[in-house]
Regions:
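Phosphate-binding site recognition
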Residues: 1-337
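A cross-kingdom feature that marks ATP-driven nucleic-acid transaction machinery
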Residues: 294, 303-468
Length: 468
């Protein structure tokens, strides 16, 4: 069953329905569902797929490309030392003159060995041969966002030739709910907090009668999926560059994120273009996300970076210590991992990050989605020249002169009146809010006490299931 991706599916289907040849580019992190989306949009067409090999030399890539051409009906030469121009020219043999023909080049970064040679050859083949066939719809797909952006989308070779670009994101809560049919709201939310919105991960959490038992099953054992997925993520996205993992590990321990200067200082990295590239690539891959405080204008200096990949956070905090200690297989997950104060605290942070991942959905429920806004968390260290420290979970600086300040609480049972008092105190420390109309909103997972529901302390009490 195909779930979600309505907007992306419509965009890709429209690209396939055009009356001329077109190039679409689809990228996103591994296991996010790129190939499934393309195959779904290509239903009813003549569909041909080619895929690169991970960590193989150019000779192996060309050999497998020839084999895939032959497997799909092309009688092509197997001569050695053929150029990419010669090999890609064979794609014309697949084009049906009377039917829409979709050709997918999947895991393009592997097929190209992360170099520009294939892309340059593709430009010539496209201009001289493929673009002449109006029924052809070429899709370039990859899981290494940095390559897809820099070598494909922004390349001089394909400049102005890409008709559609899709950066496929993990599922939101509403789609995760569809992935877990029959699960109650609270269990669906727990699954999302633990592994995020990656479709493959969510599908594994349906193997047992509960999300927690399914997760434990896929974490324990030598061949357990989740116990080795962390290494696969960093190897497939970032190769053997250790700085990517260092940044992720550092941010994992920062509940309020960190700015560029703090990353440089703590990791002893040069404050250079290399760091800019590392941060951009991590953000392209959905591992981290940057927010600019509503009090500042956007710049690299004011951005705060947060580790927003829930699975990576879960692995580094809970799984890795067990793996390194050799205790993974003999650990009772329910009692030693899940039912612990450390997990409760961790889930609270994960809930805050999940709300940051649903900024537009929250704005929609609150009724101001049509208003221009800048949104994100706010954090200021204590005892600075600007005043005492302050932290706000989520702030919308709206174009209608209102600031919506959200307090996010992941808590079992009623939320006490003290929450409202702490928020008032935090707001009073932010001078930029003193002359603003402030709308206070409480976002929680459980019913709150009557005192908080009466509208005196908060103008709106929002339950997370309202955006599911």
């Amino acid at each position: 069953m195909f779930i979600g991706r309505k907007t992306e599916l419509e965009s890709l289907s429209s690209a396939f329905a055009t009356s001329r040849a077109s190039i679409s580019v689809v990228f996103g992190r591994r296991r996010v569902g790129k190939s499934s989306l393309i195959e779904r949009a290509g239903r009813g067409t003549k569909f041909f797929a080619f895929e690169g090999l991970e960590n193989q030399p150019q000779s192996a890539q060309k050999k497998i490309f020839i084999e895939q051409l032959r497997a799909q009906g092309c009688a092509v030469s197997s001569a050695r030392n053929q150029s990419w121009y010669e090999l890609l020219s064979n794609l014309r043999l697949l084009i049906n003159p009377t039917e829409v023909t979709v050709i997918l080049l999947d895991e393009l970064q592997w097929l190209a060995n992360y170099r520009s040679e294939l892309i340059s050859a593709l430009k010539l083949v496209w201009d001289q041969i493929l673009s002449k066939h109006s029924n052809l719809k070429l899709v370039l797909c990859g899981s290494v966002a940095s390559f897809m952006v820099r070598k494909v989308i922004r390349s001089r070779a394909l400049y102005g030739r890409c008709d559609l670009t899709l950066n496929l994101q993990p599922f939101k809560l509403a789609e995760a709910k569809e992935m877990l049919p029959g699960k109650l709201h609270e269990e669906t939310l727990l699954a999302y907090l633990l592994v995020g919105g990656i479709p493959k991960y969510l599908s594994l959490l349906t193997d047992k009668d509960s999300v927690l038992r399914s997760l434990a099953f896929h974490c324990q054992g030598i061949n357990a999926y989740f116990s080795s997925e962390y290494q696969r993520i960093f190897l497939s996205h970032f190769g053997d560059n250790p700085h990517y993992e260092k940044v992720a590990r550092f941010l994992c321990g920062k509940s309020y994120g960190a700015n560029r200067s703090e990353i440089v200082e703590n990791l002893s990295l040069p404050n250079s273009g290399q760091l800019t590239e590392i941060l951009e690539n991590l953000e392209y891959a959905g591992v981290i996300h940057s927010f600019v405080p509503f009090t500042e204008k956007s710049s690299s200096r004011t951005k705060r970076f947060h580790l927003v990949d829930n699975f990576i956070r879960f692995y580094l905090t809970f799984l890795e210590p067990l793996v390194l200690g050799g205790a993974l297989e003999r650990t009772d997950f329910l009692s030693q991992v899940f039912n612990t104060p450390k997990m409760s605290s961790w889930l609270g942070i994960s809930f805050e990050l999940t709300c940051l991942n649903h900024i537009s959905e929250i704005a929609q429920v609150l009724g101001f989605a049509a208003v221009r806004y800048q949104a994100g968390p706010y954090f200021r260290h204590g005892s600075t020249s600007e005043g005492d420290g302050a932290q706000l979970d989520l702030v919308y600086k709206r174009g209608d002169m209102v600031c919506t300040v959200c307090e996010v609480k992941y808590q079992n049972g009623p939320i006490g009146i003290s929450v409202a008092k702490r928020l008032d105190e935090a707001i009073s420390k932010v001078k930029e809010l003193k002359n603003k109309t402030v709308q206070k909103v409480l976002i929680g997972k459980d019913p709150t006490s009557n005192k908080l529901e009466d509208g005196v302390n908060f103008s709106r009490v929002l339950s997370i299931d309202e955006i599911m």
